[in-house]
Every structure is written in C-alpha cells, then in structure tokens.
Amino acid sequence: MNYQILARKWRPQYFRDIIGQKHIVTAISNGLSLGRIHHAWLLSGTRGIGKTTIARLLAKSLNCQNGITSDPCRQCIICKEIEKGLCLDVIEIDGASRTKVEEMREILDSIYYSPIKSRFKVYLIDEVHMLSRHSFNALLKTLEEPPEHVKFVLATTDVDRIPKTIISRCLYFKLQIISEEKIFKFLKYILIKESIDTDEYSLKKIAYHAHGSIRDALNLLEHAINLGNGHVNIKNVTDMLGLLPEKYSFLLTDAVLKKDSKKTMLLLNKISSIGVEWEEILIEMLRFLYHISTSQSFPLVWEKIFTEKYKNQIQKIAQNNKKTNIQLCYQILLNGRKELKFAPSQKIGVEMSLLRVISAI
C-alpha cells in the first residue's frame, strides 16, 4: 500500500501552485524566463510555508532537459529524479546536523567536479543558520566566486543568525506566513479532490490553529480525517485541538457577565473534566468576547462558516450587556492570560481571572 501523506501528495510541483508567496514566485519565475540567473538564493521564513518546495522547484527549473525554465516539464529524467530525491546533482544538506567546518569543507571541495548529467550542481542547505562561524567563513569564500556550474539555495527559519556577508552575496527572499483564509480555501479544495466530507467551520478551526503554516495545516487535517474515520467534523476537530466546545464559550461568558460565581465555578469544573487546557478557556472566551464587542459596535457581516446557533448566542449576550462591561471583561481576561505563568497553577489563574471580572463589572 503506497499511501502518501497529504503534505507530500499536495506539495506544489510548479511555481504557480505555491500558495501565498506571489511576490517571490513572480521574481524567481521572471528571472528564470529572462535568463537572469543568480548563483545563490536565500529563503527565510517560518516552518511549513514553502522554503524547501521553492528550493526544489528551482533545482528542477535550472536542470530541466527542455532548457532553463520557470515551468519544468516533469517528464524528463532529470525532473523525475529531482522529484523522487534521486538526482545526484541536487545535494540536500541539513545545516543542523552538518555544523562542523570540516564537514562543510568536505562538501565544498566537491563543487569543482562537473555535474554528472545535469546542467548545474545545486546545493540546497536547509536550516543554514545552524552552521558554525567557521563553516560560514568557508561557505563565504565559495559564494564569492563559485564555479559556473554550481548554484546554492539556502533556507532558514532564523535569518538574524546568518552573517550579513552571506546575505549580501545571495538573492534574499523573505517568505510570508500564509493567511488563514488562503489555508482554509486550500484545505477545502483538497477535501473536495479527496472526496472527504467536512464542514467549513471545522476547516476554519484547523486553518486558525495552523498559525500560517501550510504543512501544519495539512498535518492537522490528516489527524482529523483519521480521528473521524474518513470524515472531518467539528466535534473531532475540537477534541483533537483540545479546544473549548462552542456551547461552553457561551455558557461560561454568560455566567460571568451575570455575576453568577457559583455557576461559573461549576462550569469550570465541568470543562476541566473533559480535558480542555486552562489557557485555552481564556483564549476561546477572548475570541467570543471579540465577536460580541464587534456586533455591539457596528453591524457585523457574519461569515458563512459560523453556525446559526453561534450567531444567536453572540447576539443574545450583545443585546443584554453594556459595551463597557464587555470591554472590561476582555481586558481583565487578556491580562489574566498574560499573568497565567505567574499563578500557583493555571487552574487558579483562570479561576481568579473570572472572579476578578465578576467583582469588577
């Protein structure tokens, strides 16, 4: 059974398929089309947003047997070998495990040999910021005047740790985190292609908790599919992410705003028994209060993904409470979240934050 995880199956194979990096894709594609090819590229950004994918696409574009192109054919031997990770002229190096200067010199000594069957030897150095100072010095000498048949693509999640002298010798591209909306649309597209049932609210939750990373979103989606036995629904997503179930956001916020201490404590005990993390309680209440506040301040155009029940809960609390109380509640809970790490325990921190709201409003 040759099952491919979603992150690999849906890895972009053309520059045009890359999500959320239009400014970078356009610059690289135009450079390839015009024949303005640099000897080194540096890609920086958080995890799972396309650095390695762009690096491999560059390797394919430079070595495609149909010529240097921004649109590799994927049919020639070189393209196929690069996609399978079998091309001997594309050398992927993990900077985190090859930090010693001796190892870097050994690698750099090989650059003077001609490519075996490709147009260029392409060195992809991932997590390049992990290299030692001496390794950077060795790399710098090569980056200054590399052989014509050699190209470098460097990738990092921490560009501040890379010497300025290295950066100045590369075409530097800073990748952006992917917007929640773009991740949501991509997940929806994948599930349609995979013929998997879902609801948009579940995908929105996954997109939010991916924190701008496509790879993280796909891994969460994979988990949700397995948990739901081939389906994705909000209950499984809520359980998987350890989120506060929607109904408790309403009940807890309502109890606090009604200054009902007893009900508040009973609800907290109930919520803790289902395994929700204490900080998550404050996060979900803050998000709920945000929606209440915006619905009070201006006519809110509700997103289609919100359930009718959720909208009704928001509107009910918004109509029955003063704007100042909602704002004060938000401020106290926000400060409570900041102070959570200083509390004797997270349980005590959350309880005291809610009791502080009840005393203040």
Swiss-Prot record:
One of its GO terms (biological process) is DNA-templated DNA replication. CDD domains: AAA, HLD_clamp_pol_III_gamma_tau. Pfam families: DNA_pol3_delta2, DNA_pol3_gamma3, DNAX_ATPase_lid. Belongs to the DnaX/STICHEL family. The keyword Coiled coil does not apply. ATP binds at residues 45-52. One of its GO terms (cellular component) is DNA polymerase III complex. Its EC number is 2.7.7.7. Keywords: ATP-binding, DNA replication, DNA-directed DNA polymerase, Metal-binding, Nucleotide-binding, Nucleotidyltransferase, Transferase, Zinc. It is an enzyme of class 2 (transferase). DNA polymerase III contains a core (composed of alpha, epsilon and theta chains) that associates with a tau subunit. This core dimerizes to form the POLIII' complex. PolIII' associates with the gamma complex (composed of gamma, delta, delta', psi and chi chains) and with the beta chain to form the complete DNA polymerase III complex. Zn(2+) binds at residues 64, 73, 76, 79. The keyword Metal-binding applies. GO terms for molecular function: ATP binding; ATP hydrolysis activity; DNA binding; DNA-directed DNA polymerase activity; metal ion binding. It catalyses: DNA(n) + a 2'-deoxyribonucleoside 5'-triphosphate = DNA(n+1) + diphosphate. This is DNA polymerase III subunit gamma. DNA polymerase III is a complex, multichain enzyme responsible for most of the replicative synthesis in bacteria. This DNA polymerase also exhibits 3' to 5' exonuclease activity. It comes from Buchnera aphidicola subsp. Acyrthosiphon pisum (strain APS) (Acyrthosiphon pisum symbiotic bacterium). The lineage of its organism: Bacteria, Pseudomonadati, Pseudomonadota, Gammaproteobacteria, Enterobacterales.
